[in-house]
């Protein structure tokens, strides 16, 4: 992937939700909710403060993050559906 986000934006690939419940019931795709977790694929350099200094982002490539179901802008790149969002749209990093 050759996308380089600008400023405080990140590129996230949604992680797929389970399509089957613990009891074995298959959830049809049109009834499943959008996943609200993803993996960070790229990060911008950061946001400038009032002094013009760049403040680095708190997330890094490979982080698993939580975000709102309707956060970000969806883009298609080489057949993959990705999200471009500001770091402020992220709720948390999932620690391993």
Curated annotation (Swiss-Prot):
Keywords noted in UniProt: Chaperone, Cytoplasm
Record carries keyword Chaperone: yes
GO molecular function terms noted in the UniProt entry: ATP binding; metal ion binding; protein folding chaperone; protein-folding chaperone binding; unfolded protein binding
A single GO BP: chaperone cofactor-dependent protein refolding
CDD domains per the UniProt record, alphabetical: cpn10
Localization per Swiss-Prot or TrEMBL: Cytoplasm
GO cellular component entries: cytoplasm
Any Pfam family: Cpn10
Main location: cytoplasm
Record carries keyword DNA repair: no
Purpose of the protein: Together with the chaperonin GroEL, plays an essential role in assisting protein folding. The GroEL-GroES system forms a nano-cage that allows encapsulation of the non-native substrate proteins and provides a physical environment optimized to promote and accelerate protein folding. GroES binds to the apical surface of the GroEL ring, thereby capping the opening of the GroEL channel.
Similarity remark: Belongs to the GroES chaperonin family.
Subunit structure: Heptamer of 7 subunits arranged in a ring. Interacts with the chaperonin GroEL.
Protein known as: Co-chaperonin GroES
Organism per entry: Delftia acidovorans (strain DSM 14801 / SPH-1)
Gene responsible for this protein: groES
């Amino acid at each position: 992937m050759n996308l380089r986000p600008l400023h405080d934006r990140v590129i996230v690939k949604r992680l797929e939700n389970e399509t089957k419940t613990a009891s074995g019931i298959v959830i049809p795709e049109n009834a499943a909710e959008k996943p609200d977790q993803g993996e960070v694929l790229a990060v911008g350099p950061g946001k400038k403060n009032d002094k013009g200094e760049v403040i680095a982002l708190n997330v890094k490539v490979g982080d698993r993050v939580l975000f709102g179901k309707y956060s970000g802008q969806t883009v298609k790149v080489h057949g993959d559906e990705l999200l471009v969002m500001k770091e402020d749209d992220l709720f948390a990093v999932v620690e391993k």
